[in-house]
Amino acid sequence: MSKSHSEAGSAFIQTQQLHAAMADTFLEHMCRLDIDSAPITARNTGIICTIGPASRSVETLKEMIKSGMNVARMNFSHGTHEYHAETIKNVRTATESFASDPILYRPVAVALDTKGPEIRTGLIKGSGTAEVELKKGATLKITLDNAYMEKCDENILWLDYKNICKVVDVGSKVYVDDGLISLQVKQKGPDFLVTEVENGGFLGSKKGVNLPGAAVDLPAVSEKDIQDLKFGVEQDVDMVFASFIRKAADVHEVRKILGEKGKNIKIISKIENHEGVRRFDEILEASDGIMVARGDLGIEIPAEKVFLAQKMIIGRCNRAGKPVICATQMLESMIKKPRPTRAEGSDVANAVLDGADCIMLSGETAKGDYPLEAVRMQHLIAREAEAAMFHRKLFEELARSSSHSTDLMEAMAMGSVEASYKCLAAALIVLTESGRSAHQVARYRPRAPIIAVTRNHQTARQAHLYRGIFPVVCKDPVQEAWAEDVDLRVNLAMNVGKARGFFKKGDVVIVLTGWRPGSGFTNTMRVVPVP
């Protein structure tokens, strides 16, 4: 499977950690990692950025796309439809500003993140950005009286969950703002709770509330979610991040609301509570992909167990060949500082090493002081971590875990990735209509980037969900002769790869094409030197 280092020669562009990637044992692999080994130019992991006040101007979005943003996430827990419509328009304007050059054009996907059946606090009186300090030991009254909806302060807090007094008991815990603030219930009334502040801190407006252990009876898809999903279909979003998915039926419900018109929208289920982890397999089967939403997960299950859930979820998604996103607090300190903590750098790298297809930024890009730096940081860390994957072992295990199927595309994908290791290919070029061929290749985790050429804009945008796929949109009209059309698209991929520094003249690339037009006919693999 491996050539010796010297044999690969200096012409080979991808020296990144090759020695370590081809080790025989995991210990040997770790021992061979080298801090002076340069990573490959391409980054294989997708970067998802939440767009908010700090990043929604067209100019900032252009810079974020240049810095490496692949998917723009709209968080529907905040903002009106008009606000999000404008943000989506800005994202598309920024994306299309690069469209004049087919080689530099990067399709950016739009993701709608539903509010889901969550509980949130009201507005702190004053302004939307006002905060109040809750001191440890102080008494805080939680009320359902709508008179306080926009008048919360350090003494009284309004919540939007009408049944809270029925599901919590005296002695129960109430967590606010990803668990940063904890309250203990001391007394219950018909429409209020009296609590004592256990862990204090500064509280802002519209923060999430968790009631671990309580049987919260909220519907999987709220009335607001239904309106938001319909709005998403109108706006032609590429994917939905569905919050608080607890079982397969929840996913089917989201799919039903998206309807015929939204049937191509990918549904990514967010796993953020104990039931979601426990019933993970049925959720995975019903979904197009998964997000490990570590914020709420870390309150609903003990904080020290979150990494177990993360590894289990990523492992099962990799095995099933479905995309998985790691999210929440990845570079949290960069909201206020230009550099991440060492722990955060490690966290991003380890999510990539675990096998995440995408990594996500939330507050870092939505409201932080350093949105561009955060994107660049994720880009740099992801590239280094990808090079340090134990590729040889990973490929063997993925190949072994895939069942013997009559699906020819799967055999092609596995064969092309194995060939790419054997001949140290600098890239794999895949011509794809629906994107399926490229997704199958990505499933086997080649070291080299997969340049997927398609004429379908949505296929290109959604391809960012899969690790390693670099989508290229072919805007040229279809040629009459099939062979000429194939050559046209392969040449476009060659030009993009050279312009991006993925490979240079004389390197070897693997080209996967179909033998006739249409989806589902990819069956030809060639090993081609770069002209």
UniProtKB/Swiss-Prot annotation:
Cross-link Glycyl lysine isopeptide (Lys-Gly) (interchain with G-Cter in SUMO1), where in sequence: 166
Entry protein name: Pyruvate kinase PKM
Chain positions with Phosphothreonine modification: 41, 195
Positions carrying N6,N6,N6-trimethyllysine: 3
Similarity field: Belongs to the pyruvate kinase family.
Binding site for K(+): 75, 77, 113-114
Binding site residues for Mg(2+): 272, 296
Spans through the membrane: none
UniProt site (Transition state stabilizer): 270
Residues that, per the record, bind L-serine: 70, 106, 464
PANTHER family according to UniProt: PYRUVATE KINASE (PTHR11817)
Binding site for ATP: 75-78, 120, 207
Modified residues annotated as N-acetylserine in this record: 2
Further facts: There are 4 isozymes of pyruvate kinase in mammals (L, R, M1, M2) encoded by 2 different genes: PKLR and PKM. The L and R isozymes are generated from the PKLR by differential splicing of RNA; the M1 and M2 forms are produced from the PKM gene by differential splicing. L type is major isozyme in the liver, R is found in red cells, M1 is the main form in muscle, heart and brain, and M2 is found in early fetal tissues as well as in most cancer cells.
GO molecular function: ATP binding; magnesium ion binding; mRNA binding; potassium ion binding; protein tyrosine kinase activity; pyruvate kinase activity
Pathway: Carbohydrate degradation; glycolysis; pyruvate from D-glyceraldehyde 3-phosphate: step 5/5
Span list, region Interaction with POU5F1: 307-531
Function: Catalyzes the final rate-limiting step of glycolysis by mediating the transfer of a phosphoryl group from phosphoenolpyruvate (PEP) to ADP, generating ATP. The ratio between the highly active tetrameric form and nearly inactive dimeric form determines whether glucose carbons are channeled to biosynthetic processes or used for glycolytic ATP production. The transition between the 2 forms contributes to the control of glycolysis and is important for tumor cell proliferation and survival.
Binding residue positions for beta-D-fructose 1,6-bisphosphate: 432-437, 482, 489, 516-521
Keywords of the record: Acetylation, Allosteric enzyme, ATP-binding, Cytoplasm, Glycolysis, Isopeptide bond, Kinase, Magnesium, Metal-binding, Methylation, Nucleotide-binding, Nucleus, Phosphoprotein, Potassium, Pyruvate, S-nitrosylation, Transferase, Translation regulation, Ubl conjugation
Requisite cofactors: Mg(2+); K(+)
Keyword Manganese included in the entry's annotation: no
Organism of this sequence: Oryctolagus cuniculus (Rabbit)
Enzyme Commission identifier(s): 2.7.1.40, 2.7.11.1, 2.7.10.2
Gene Ontology biological-process annotations: positive regulation of cytoplasmic translation; positive regulation of sprouting angiogenesis
Domain of life, source organism: Eukaryota
Post-translational modification N6-acetyllysine, affected residues: 62, 89, 166, 266, 270, 305, 322, 475
